[in-house]
């Protein structure tokens, strides 16, 4: 999939789940499942409940996403 096809959203992590997965509440009120991107896992960037994050989602499945940035 080309990078241009990804849709970016911002939201707040509502729950941290096992296996580096999270439940994220988007700005539009929808709750989705998300996982930390490979570079975030590699650099051991911690994501906790309440953190503001930016995630990308495929237009084909709007229930799952990949977290690619944690706001400070």
UniProtKB/Swiss-Prot annotation:
Cell cycle keyword on record: no
Compartments in which it is found: Cytoplasm
Keywords per UniProt: Cytoplasm, Initiation factor, Protein biosynthesis, RNA-binding, rRNA-binding
Gene Ontology MF terms: ribosome binding; rRNA binding; translation initiation factor activity
Positions of the S1-like domain: 1-72
InterPro entries referenced in this protein's UniProt entry, alphabetically: NA-bd_OB-fold, RNA-binding_domain_S1_IF1, S1_domain, TIF_IF1
Pfam families: eIF-1a
GO CC annotations on file: cytosol
Keyword Plastid: no
Domain of life (superkingdom): Bacteria
Ranges in a coiled coil: none
Family affiliation: Belongs to the IF-1 family.
Function: One of the essential components for the initiation of protein synthesis. Stabilizes the binding of IF-2 and IF-3 on the 30S subunit to which N-formylmethionyl-tRNA(fMet) subsequently binds. Helps modulate mRNA selection, yielding the 30S pre-initiation complex (PIC). Upon addition of the 50S ribosomal subunit IF-1, IF-2 and IF-3 are released leaving the mature 70S translation initiation complex.
Family matches, as PANTHER family: TRANSLATION INITIATION FACTOR IF-1, CHLOROPLASTIC
Assembly, per entry: Component of the 30S ribosomal translation pre-initiation complex which assembles on the 30S ribosome in the order IF-2 and IF-3, IF-1 and N-formylmethionyl-tRNA(fMet); mRNA recruitment can occur at any time during PIC assembly.
Protein name (database record): Translation initiation factor IF-1 2
Lineage of origin: Bacteria, Pseudomonadati, Pseudomonadota, Betaproteobacteria, Burkholderiales
């Amino acid at each position: 999939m080309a990078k241009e096809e990804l849709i970016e959203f911002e939201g707040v992590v509502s729950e941290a789940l096992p296996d580096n997965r999270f439940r994220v509440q988007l700005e539009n009120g929808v709750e989705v499942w998300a996982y930390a991107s490979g570079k975030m896992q590699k650099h051991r960037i911690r994501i906790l409940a309440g953190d503001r994050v930016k995630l990308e989602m495929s237009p084909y499945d709007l229930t799952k996403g990949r977290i690619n940035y944690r706001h400070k």
